[in-house]
Amino acid sequence: MASIRELHSQLVRKERSAVEIAEAALQRIETLEPQLKSFLHVTADQAIAQAKAVDQRIAAGEEISLLAGIPIGIKDNLCTRGIPTTCASKILQGFVPPYESTVTQRLAEAGAVAVGKTNLDEFAVGSSTENSAYQTTANPWDLTRVPGGSSGGSAAAVAADECVVALGSDTGGSIRQPAAFCGVVGLKPTYGLVSRYGLVAYASSLDQIGPFSRSVEDTAILLGAIAGHDPKDATSLKVEVPDYTQFLKPSLAGIKVGVITETVTDSPAGQAMQAALEVLQGLGAEIREISCPRFAYGLPAYYIIAPSEASANLARYDGVKYGYRVEEAETLIDMYCRTRAEGFGSEVKRRIMIGTYALSAGYYDAYYLKAQKVRTLIKQDFEAAFAEVDVLVSPTTPTTAFKAGEKTADPLSMYLSDLMTIPVNSAGLPGLSLPCGFDEAGLPYGLQIIGNVLREDQVLHTAYAYEQATEWHLRQPAL
């Protein structure tokens, strides 16, 4: 499928209709879904109706936005009015939200065509999309491997050309890690830049919604459509949203790029990053080594803070108001216990237990409070780094995509796949992953580019210059 601008040009020139584009995406989904399993719900009727509305506007001579008629996938933890939103959990089986999330509302107003709700790790808890209660998504580059997580469905759908762009959410790497594993572009914006209203909460101080695409330009276009203040979200920032595409320039002259020394290794992923640094330097960037001493402590701090917030956020699912409820419970307490025991998967239960333990009276200071102090130190490390450089880079992940089932019995090994991405969430910074090479098995590596608060412009500029100087993003999986 073509880029957003290419499809927009075809629409305004009446070379293709929005309905034809939507039908092509839906046909691709129908063909690939038996093996890929990216989507939990395909919204064919809605997609055709939205596409017809775009065609009617074009026929009437109205101007349309860049996103009008563009097929998009929506992660299934974003509320969509009248369309099931399950968070890939049995406990929300059959739940149909009575309201629309801010981001999906903004995309609908822009004329985007939603083709379906994408698979994820249950309640966005996981790094492989194997924790879904309904199906396991495959990696388009190798169907025996995971697409990453928790937004694996969105990443796989974009990589497989089932949609042009998609939305995901990122709490500790859930956009960037699957973007790296699937060889696409994924951006976690600054915390508060994109409204979380209608995003089913996992860890509220870390969650952020962002775009997946196959190019940096498409990422910039989608970010511009979903960013901006929202009075319905108390953490939403009151900032002007620029046209992010204006920052996409091929030269990096004057840009200072910091390499996080704690992420430099001789591993294949480290070597892919070193090759990328040579490209950045050739584009005019000044490369510096920058130490973030507490970088590695982001992982253990995160696995106290995020489960603690999750234990509170997930307490609302009790079988009373919506979703799954056990039959013939003897008492109210019995109904609560059995509903949650049957409705939640094993990883969600593990996080709830960790969080409840960390918040308990005897351990609060030793765990939760200490983790928050570590989070502050990590943020201070980044502040010191950005006093010297414009952007920071690291590998997105320590390895390429692993085999399905390889890490499910070893949670710690699974958690380590987010080692590079988690600190960015802890500090509330923007971070982007884009393809920077392939391993011997033909699996993609990701380069992570991190910016200072609200400096998405510099992140996108650096990513675009690198992308245009290389051809990694042009490779496609053979499906």
Curated annotation (Swiss-Prot):
It catalyses: L-glutamyl-tRNA(Gln) + L-glutamine + ATP + H2O = L-glutaminyl-tRNA(Gln) + L-glutamate + ADP + phosphate + H(+). It holds the Pfam family Amidase. Its EC number is 6.3.5.7. Heterotrimer of A, B and C subunits. Belongs to the amidase family. GatA subfamily. This is Glutamyl-tRNA(Gln) amidotransferase subunit A. The active site is at K75 (charge relay system), S150 (charge relay system), S174 (acyl-ester intermediate). GO terms for molecular function: ATP binding; glutaminyl-tRNA synthase (glutamine-hydrolyzing) activity. It comes from the Bacteria. Allows the formation of correctly charged Gln-tRNA(Gln) through the transamidation of misacylated Glu-tRNA(Gln) in organisms which lack glutaminyl-tRNA synthetase. The reaction takes place in the presence of glutamine and ATP through an activated gamma-phospho-Glu-tRNA(Gln). GO terms for biological process: translation. The keyword Ligase applies. GO terms for cellular component: glutamyl-tRNA(Gln) amidotransferase complex. The keyword Cell inner membrane does not apply. Keywords: ATP-binding, Ligase, Nucleotide-binding, Protein biosynthesis.
